Amino acid sequence: MTYYGYSGKILRLDMTSRKAIAIDTEPYRRWGGGHGMGAALFWDFCKDKTITDGRHPANVCCVVTSPLCGTIVPSAGGRCEVVGVGVGQYPVSWFTRTNFGGRFSTMLNYAGWDGIVIDGKADSPVWVDIRDGQVIFHAAQNLWGKDTWATQLEIRDRIKLLCSRTKTHADYLFGINVRNGISVLPTKQNSIADML
């Protein structure tokens, strides 16, 4: 099947069981990527749609690219949409969305994924290493409590050790938000770290 801008699969990270599952993109293509696809994924995978706390284990965080990611389309080739029940909104959290730019969405798309659905809650801190089709959950107790900069350095050094010496590692990209519990780190080989 021709996907016309889509990679054809979405990565579901079940943090409770530490399993990575590939979801077919086809049922979500009609939502167009980004906010539409993220909202559809949220409503399909969120088990309790009445939650009002973004930190609740039933919350689902969807990080979704678009069919234009990695293209030269101005203002569209590098945006990534994040959808779910927000954290820390006053007076209560609610279903919301945000987006960010940079190379994350492009690199995720190049790795063969149209998005990531994160659900559940890990029983201890973990980070998830995504390199193209391979997904590995790593213990992250040594990162817990560190600030953003220290976390970046620690994961970057770990990624270098995990990579082959013949590969280039000069192109690291960090997007880490330790306070809210989510950290992502794509590299040229597309590693994404997610600490919960």
Describe each model-derived feature in a short phrase:
Residues 43-79:
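Conserved oxyanion/phosphate-binding beta-strand-loop segments in alpha/beta enzyme cores
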Residues 4-6, 56-59, 178:
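Short, basic and Ser/Thr-rich N-terminal targeting/leader segments
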Residues 94-95, 105-196:
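Active-site cavity-forming subdomains of large catalytic enzyme subunits
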Residues 24-55:
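Non-catalytic, usually N-terminal nucleic-acid engagement modules in DNA/RNA processing proteins
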Residues 77-98, 185:
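Extended, non-catalytic structural segments that build the interaction scaffolds
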Residues 101-102:
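Thiamine diphosphate
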Residues 1-28, 32:
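N-terminal leader/transition segments
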Residues 21, 71-74, 170, 193-194:
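Short helix/loop capping segments that flank catalytic or ligand/cofactor-binding pockets
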